[in-house]
């Protein structure tokens, strides 16, 4: 996939991205990230359409293309993803997966915007009505790891969002937060979010109780019976 994106010209990438063959479509879609800065409007419109493709490999190709765009121009990618965050679940999933790549989150300012986008997407997840559809499940799964990638890059900025969503009564949002907190990269933030347990002082030794003296047995008194003469 990477080789095709690097070697193929833009015409071939366009053709591949529209192919009925899933692998060719994956390669062409992923490679369009190289063309995006030269033809931004056309490419981003097409990628947004492909983000909702029924084939999961093509949808994955969109995320790869977005990451490639981000490596060239993170401000351009962020501007587009703010728009995608208001789209349907498949497109939102592409935005989250495209942004939450560790090497794209080296600057705090970028990560702060990514957290804002994830917050918007999570808000729409909590308001979803039909949760049995595939697009909802795909978005839920992506959010189950994307938050932790962004949070690991900027834990202090992420903490208020986690505190907010950890208090949600929505079962799917609760799963998303729990899944992210279970990641090894979340160890530091997980400790901050855990309720602190009060320290227990050392128990003072109980004073030894003195044994009570046993009561002395009373001496029996003999009663004499007088005999009448």
Task: For the regions a language model picked out, list residue spans one by one.
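Alpha-helical scaffold domains
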Residues: 1-216, 226-229
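Long, intrinsically disordered low-complexity tandem-repeat segments
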Residues: 221-225
């Amino acid at each position: 996939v990477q080789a095709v994106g690097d070697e193929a010209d833009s015409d071939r990438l366009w053709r591949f991205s529209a192919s009925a063959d899933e692998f060719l479509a994956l390669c062409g879609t992923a490679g369009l990230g190289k063309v995006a800065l030269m033809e931004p409007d056309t490419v981003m419109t097409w990628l947004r359409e492909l983000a909702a493709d029924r084939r999961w490999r093509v949808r994955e190709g969109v995320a790869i293309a977005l990451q490639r765009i981000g490596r060239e121009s993170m401000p351009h990618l962020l501007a587009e993803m703010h728009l995608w965050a208001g789209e349907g679940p498949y497109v939102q999933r592409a935005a989250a997966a495209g942004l939450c790549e560790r090497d794209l989150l080296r600057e705090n300012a970028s990560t702060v915007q990514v957290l804002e986008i994830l917050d918007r997407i999570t808000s729409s997840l909590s308001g979803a009505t039909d949760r049995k559809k595939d697009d909802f499940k795909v978005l839920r799964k992506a959010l189950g790891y994307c938050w932790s990638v962004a949070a690991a890059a900027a834990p202090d900025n992420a903490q208020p969002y986690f505190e907010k969503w950890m208090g949600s009564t929505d079962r799917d949002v609760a799963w998303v937060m729990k899944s992210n907190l279970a990641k090894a990269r979340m160890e530091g933030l997980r400790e901050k979010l855990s309720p602190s347990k009060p320290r227990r002082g050392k128990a003072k030794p109980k004073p030894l109780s003195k044994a009570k003296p046993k009561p002395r047995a009373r001496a029996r008194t003999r009663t004499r019976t007088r005999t009448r003469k």
